[in-house]
């Protein structure tokens, strides 16, 4: 079926390139001819190979349109190997405060299916925990969880994040489920710290953030827009981000359901400058956020150099946006993704058996 679709659309170059890169770089599941890629379950190096492929893909598109901008910050990769032990703790703390939880016996962090390689990377790198599947009411696979259940491994994790919590939510859960007596660790109270000096925000943004790049149109005009967005139920974390980055704004949004959300946005070249500098130093480790950030970084550099409205720049940006916008997956692709997730789950479960 996929092969037939590709044959029908061979004259649409942009679509073909988009489909090819989507299959190869977003999921690493299939060859260009629709044949499942054989091989062992992903190891730590797989996420690095994936990021290098994504980066090279973006640079190739830049070169294709002969866009002359400084590629130094687009052309480098930074992983946990490049972090100090202290920085690793800040990244884990931000991720844990964003999408983590503490239960009766378990520490857990949830990841989207697209970030299954990140979950596996962290599990393998730190050699703690295992990966499990998360299903919806229709028994469809929707996410994966990195679960840490062994006492010694929980102590390793808590030693990394101890003294690096910004909020009381995980701190309160730690005492609620009696981990203060079960683990040989005195958990320090959360405290405010300078977010610009460590990768806490990278971890938190990997969990809860969003980089947007797009065109806004009005009548016969269009202009390039990009921003960083974070949404929370209260404004505490957002206020701290605004305080230390000295930019952006916070909006309060009330919904008909009675819920309230606070939304932080930095949405101009001037507002994004400190974030560009920060994320160039502490790059996103989430596959989704990394792709979003590469696109935003390119858009930012184009606008900074007043190249963003040139014909070649517009065509290039639209191709990159199309590359990111492909969301619909065939049943075959979904099955391949599910199989990859199951391989990782089985592998980490086997490695976790004492």
UniProtKB/Swiss-Prot annotation:
Keyword Hydrolase: yes
GO terms for biological process, alphabetical: intron homing
One Gene Ontology CC term in the entry: mitochondrion
Subcellular location: Mitochondrion
GO molecular function, one term: endonuclease activity
Pfam families for the chain: LAGLIDADG_1
Role: Mitochondrial DNA endonuclease involved in intron homing.
More info: Endonuclease aI5 beta (group I intron) is encoded within an intron of the mitochondrial COX1 gene. Splicing from COX1 requires PET54, MRS1, SUV3 and MSS18. Translational initiation codon is predicted to be ATA rather than ATG.
Name of the featured protein: Intron-encoded DNA endonuclease aI5 beta
Gene name per UniProt: AI5_BETA
């Amino acid at each position: 079926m996929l092969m037939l679709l590709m044959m029908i659309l061979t004259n649409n170059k942009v679509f073909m390139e988009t489909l090819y890169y989507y299959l190869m770089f977003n999921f690493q599941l299939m060859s260009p001819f629709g044949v499942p890629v054989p091989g062992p379950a992903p190891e730590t190096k797989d996420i690095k190979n994936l990021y290098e492929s994504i980066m090279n893909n973006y640079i190739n598109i830049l070169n294709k349109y002969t866009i002359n901008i400084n590629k130094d910050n687009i052309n480098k990769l930074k992983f946990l190997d490049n972090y100090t032990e202290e920085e690793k703790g800040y990244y884990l703390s931000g991720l844990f405060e964003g999408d983590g939880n503490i239960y009766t016996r378990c520490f857990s962090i949830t990841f989207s299916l697209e970030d299954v390689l990140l979950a596996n990377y962290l599990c393998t790198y730190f050699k703690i925990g295992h990966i499990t599947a998360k299903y919806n009411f229709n028994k469809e696979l929707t996410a994966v969880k990195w679960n840490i259940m062994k006492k010694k491994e929980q102590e390793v994790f808590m030693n990394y994040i101890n003294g690096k919590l910004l909020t009381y939510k995980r701190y309160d859960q730690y005492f609620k489920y009696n981990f203060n007596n079960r683990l040989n660790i005195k958990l320090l109270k959360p405290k405010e710290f300078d977010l610009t000096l460590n990768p806490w925000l990278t971890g938190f943004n990997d969990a809860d953030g969003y980089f947007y790049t797009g065109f806004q149109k009005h009548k016969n005009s269009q202009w390039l827009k990009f921003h960083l967005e974070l949404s929370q139920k209260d404004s505490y974390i957002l206020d701290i981000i605004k305080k230390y980055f000295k930019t952006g704004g916070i909006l309060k949004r009330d919904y008909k359901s009675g819920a309230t959300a606070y939304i932080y946005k930095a949405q101009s070249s001037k507002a994004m400058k400190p974030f560009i500098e920060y994320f160039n130093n502490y790059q996103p480790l989430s596959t989704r956020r990394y792709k979003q950030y590469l696109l935003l970084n390119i858009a930012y550099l184009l606008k900074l150099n007043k190249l963003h409205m040139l014909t070649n720049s517009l065509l290039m940006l639209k191709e990159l946006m199309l590359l990111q916008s492909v969301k619909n997956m065939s049943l075959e692709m979904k099955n391949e993704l599910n199989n990859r997730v199951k391989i990782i789950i089985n592998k980490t479960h086997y490695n976790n058996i004492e």
